[in-house]
Curated annotation (Swiss-Prot):
It comes from Photorhabdus laumondii subsp. laumondii (strain DSM 15139 / CIP 105565 / TT01). Pathway: Glycolipid biosynthesis; lipid IV(A) biosynthesis; lipid IV(A) from (3R)-3-hydroxytetradecanoyl-[acyl-carrier-protein] and UDP-N-acetyl-alpha-D-glucosamine: step 6/6. Its EC number is 2.7.1.130. Belongs to the LpxK family. This is Tetraacyldisaccharide 4'-kinase. It catalyses: a lipid A disaccharide + ATP = a lipid IVA + ADP + H(+). Keywords: ATP-binding, Kinase, Lipid A biosynthesis, Lipid biosynthesis, Lipid metabolism, Nucleotide-binding, Transferase. One of its GO terms (cellular component) is plasma membrane. One of its GO terms (molecular function) is tetraacyldisaccharide 4'-kinase activity. InterPro entries: LpxK, P-loop_NTPase. GO terms for biological process: lipid A biosynthetic process; lipopolysaccharide core region biosynthetic process. Transfers the gamma-phosphate of ATP to the 4'-position of a tetraacyldisaccharide 1-phosphate intermediate (termed DS-1-P) to form tetraacyldisaccharide 1,4'-bis-phosphate (lipid IVA).
Length: 331
């Protein structure tokens, strides 16, 4: 239903417009308070890159964060990551993510980023606190923040907006009548726009999410998706149909598809009922990090990687690296 409302295919969004107007007024005044100097953002001693979006729901920003961290690591930079940690609840904040920290504490995305990149990750509702915690515990050259485009309390040096190239901005309204956290004009103030799927508009970088081999969650075996028989798919991400479509493009013969809410916490009993012993359960890597402790031999996950045009991606990286060189020269 929410997809129909946000896409403009249902008139019910009209009933929510007063609340959207209030949301837009509050968010606009908040941005204006920083723009006019009534409130001052905190500036970190190292460059900060924000990877975020304008809409609620999954746009593919976490794969972009992982791609960016890995690219900067290859260039020899020490990268830290901060996140709000949606879906997690820690006893205290800021929380430094380690191998012993669970998704119930930190949220699925911070655990996934740390697992994939090995980069230090800190979680806190206030990202300034997360950045300070990282800098107090390790020497870093740059901070990447997973989400936080609207978190103006943290001064940023480079902004990347990730948008869904198929759904774009729906009906264009602020939450809750539409999907927008900020209106599309906000894109005029970011440094780079990355479009996940669909047809990119002029000035946007196209991105695809590529997955090749599924990984067994117990044995670690890697296997082509089309060679996994009697597959049942599940996804608890911002837009599950995208994952199901990816599996089908890879040749999966899906018997059933189960869509869960983003940041869904799972139990062993809940997932064991999705696929019997003669079937195989296929899930996203974001879901898998929440299920390793009770994974079954017939459970698999599909890692995906962000792929950007090499030349344009390198241009963006060079701009970020120039910030690092400028910061190093000023010390």
């Amino acid at each position: 239903m929410i997809e129909r409302i946000w896409s403009g295919r249902s008139w019910l969004y009209l009933l929510l417009l007063p609340f959207s107007a209030l949301y837009g007024l509050i968010s606009g005044l908040r941005w204006l308070s920083y723009k006019t100097g009534l409130r001052l953002p905190w500036k970190a001693p190292v460059p900060v890159v924000v990877v975020g979006n304008l809409t609620a729901g999954g746009n593919g920003k976490t794969p972009v964060v992982i791609w960016l961290v890995e690219q900067l690591q290859k260039k020899g930079y020490r990268v830290g990551v901060v996140s709000r940690g949606y879906g997690g609840k820690a006893e205290s904040y800021p929380l430094l993510v380690t191998e012993n920290v669970t998704t119930a504490q930190a949220g699925d995305e911070p655990v996934l980023i740390h697992r994939r990149t090995g980069a230090p990750v800190a979680v806190a509702p206030k990202r300034v606190a997360a950045v300070k915690a990282l800098l107090a515990n390790t020497s870093l050259d740059i901070i990447v923040t997973d989400d936080g485009l609207q978190h103006y309390a943290l001064q940023r040096d480079f902004e990347i907006a990730v948008i869904d190239g198929v759904r774009r901005f729906g009906n264009g309204w602020w939450l809750p009548a539409g999907p927008m956290r900020e209106l599309s004009g906000r894109l005029n103030r970011v440094n780079t726009i990355i479009t996940n799927g669909g047809t990119p508009q002029p000035g946007e970088l196209s991105m695809t999410l590529a997955g090749e081999l599924a990984v067994n969650m117990v044995s670690g075996e890697k296997r082509a998706v089309n060679l996994i028989p009697h597959a049942v798919a599940m996804a608890g991400i911002g837009h599950p149909p995208r994952f199901f479509a990816t599996l089908q493009q890879l040749g999966a013969d899906l018997k059933k598809e189960y869509a869960f809410a983003d940041h869904q916490l799972y139990t062993e009993d809940q997932l064991c009922h999705l696929a019997d012993t003669n079937q195989n359960l296929l899930m996203t890597e974001k879901d898998a990090v929440k299920c390793f402790n009770f994974a079954q031999p017939n459970w698999w996950y599909l890692p995906v990687d962000a792929r950007l045009p090499q030349e344009k991606g390198e241009i963006m990286l060079n701009k970020i690296c120039s910030l690092l060189e400028t910061n190093n020269n000023s010390k």
